Design a protein with these regions (language model features):
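An anionic, glycine-rich sequence signature occurring as long contiguous blocks
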Residues: 4-22, 252-354, 437-444
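Generic beta-strand/beta-sheet core signal
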Residues: 91, 156, 196, 232-234, ...
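Short, glycine-/Ser/Thr-/acidic-enriched flexible segments
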Residues: 158-160, 190, 199-201, 258-260, ...
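Basic, amphipathic alpha-helical segments enriched in Lys/Arg and hydrophobic/aromatic residues
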Residues: 355-425
Length: 444
């Protein structure tokens, strides 16, 4: 029998008593709150559905870690803040993570190692990625039951810096870096992701947007035939093919325009009026107007909203093109400006979920990683939805992780039960209990 000697650690003294620590406290985890994610996943089947999208060419008799376990391990790890496969080296025996992935914390085998997870990510095929795209939309429909009056689609692109010789990594002049150029589509009201597409680094912001939106609109109409659909986007998506698509599909849109001399000329009178009012009052002026406009690349005239501000620093003008018949200021302030929330969702994905940690050499493997990070975000989104009416109803996912998932606990296994002894000093016990109660009561 092997005997393990644990070295005692000394931390000085306190009121004449020696402060001593050692590492023989038992199977203790710092992520016991992750069991909330296990409950959510059990109700919505996010990881199980994602596993069904994948192909497994391995011989069954040689498989130790099946696809369902591998994808649970990756998605739950990302949600807990362990985005790198390298983290599996130290976390594969963590009792909470093992429990979350349907393994017994003590008697079951440890989870997959970093090399196994790396092979898992690099095996993905184009067909599997298409199925994952479909599954992400199905999860959206499951979490947004109808009927619905209005659906707002927000589309935006972001940069993902690359390193070394990664496939389809290119220099982008606007961002001035070698990068990938992911495309994200969110529900503009709830903030739930509908699509995430990884693209080469040298693509335009609107690249592939028409094809993705056309398919998405078709599926939205089928799922919510009663709903009015509105598309919002910034000037990176100011391309005629998107206007035409929306008009053909009966979709409302409001899309930013890049300011040019012709637009300035059309709004010159409004600018002069704003300047005059500012000089008279000394207070910031904010005026709106609308007019018909046709760029050289457009097949027809379209309605353009002009916003003109005048202040101490001078003029600030913005233009949007739309087919919505609302008063200019109401359309701009109540519809278009709210598009900015999508940028906050992308920030959450990048800063809290580390969705820009796409470090594989293979491009398809990085697209797969983007889906894994997005599904992890979906779980945390669902957790936040089950906290409506509490202090965490509008919390960032990083705050949810710190307050509800990072809980110290001792986990032990008996012949009949798995016992999870949460830290007595955990300060959010009532909130955690309420979250679990809401999750268990949530409709599926």
């Amino acid at each position: 029998m092997n005997t393990v000697c644990h070295k005692q650690l000394s931390f000085g003294s306190l009121f004449g008593k020696h402060v001593t620590a050692d590492f023989d406290g038992g199977h203790i985890t710092s992520d016991a709150g992750g069991l909330l994610l296990r409950e959510l996943d059990g109700r919505y089947g996010i990881t199980e559905g994602a596993a069904r999208c994948l192909d497994d060419p391995r011989h069954r008799s040689w498989v130790i870690h099946d696809l369902k376990t591998l994808i649970k391990q990756r998605i739950f790890s990302i949600a807990l803040g362990y985005e790198d496969t390298n983290d599996a080296t130290t976390l594969r025996s963590d009792p909470a993570l093992k429990t979350m992935t349907e393994r017994l914390p003590e008697s079951s085998l440890d989870l997959a190692s970093q090399p196994t997870l790396c092979r898992f990510e690099n095996r993905v095929s184009k067909k599997a990625l298409r199925r994952l795209a479909d599954w992400l939309f199905e999860v959206y429909v499951k979490t947004h039951p109808g009927p619905r009056d209005v659906i707002v689609i927000d589309i935006d692109a972001t940069d993902d810096p690359t390193h070394g010789q990664q496939q389809l990594s290119f220099f982008h002049g606007y961002y001035e870096e070698h990068m990938y150029h992911p495309l994200f589509i969110f529900d503009g009201i709830s903030g739930f992701p509908m699509a995430c597409i990884l693209r080469p680094g040298n693509t335009h912001a609107s690249h592939r947007s028409k094809a993705v939106l056309k398919r998405l609109m078709k599926r939205l109409k089928k799922a919510y035939p009663e709903a009015e659909i509105v598309l919002r986007a910034d000037a990176g998506f100011a391309v005629p093919r998107l206007y035409s698509l929306c008009e053909q599909e009966g979709i409302h849109y409001v899309i930013g325009l890049i300011t040019n001399d012709r637009l300035k000329e059309k709004s010159a009178e409004l600018l002069a009026k704003a300047k005059e009012q500012f000089e008279q009052s000394g207070e910031k002026q904010r005026l709106f107007t609308s007019f018909n406009y046709q760029a050289d690349s457009w097949s027809r005239y379209r309605r353009v909203i002009a916003k003109t501000e005048y202040m101490d620093k001078g003029a600030n003008q913005r233009f949007v093109v739309t087919n919505i018949a609302l008063k200019p200021q109401r359309l701009y302030d109540e519809i278009y400006v709210l598009r900015g929330e999508t940028e906050n969702r992308i920030k959450e994905l990048k800063l809290e979920i580390k969705a820009d940690r796409l470090s594989c050499h293979r491009f398809l493997a990085n697209q797969f990683r983007l889906y894994l990070h997005t599904f992890a975000y979906c779980l945390l989104w669902l957790l936040r939805e089950n906290l409506q009416g509490t202090e965490l109803a509008n919390a960032q996912v990083g705050t949810l992780r710190v307050k509800l998932l990072k809980i110290g606990a001792r986990i032990r296994e008996s012949s009949r039960r798995v016992w999870i002894h949460l830290a007595s000093g955990y300060p959010y016990q009532a909130l955690f209990s309420l979250a679990l109660q809401n999750v268990k009561a949530a409709p599926t």
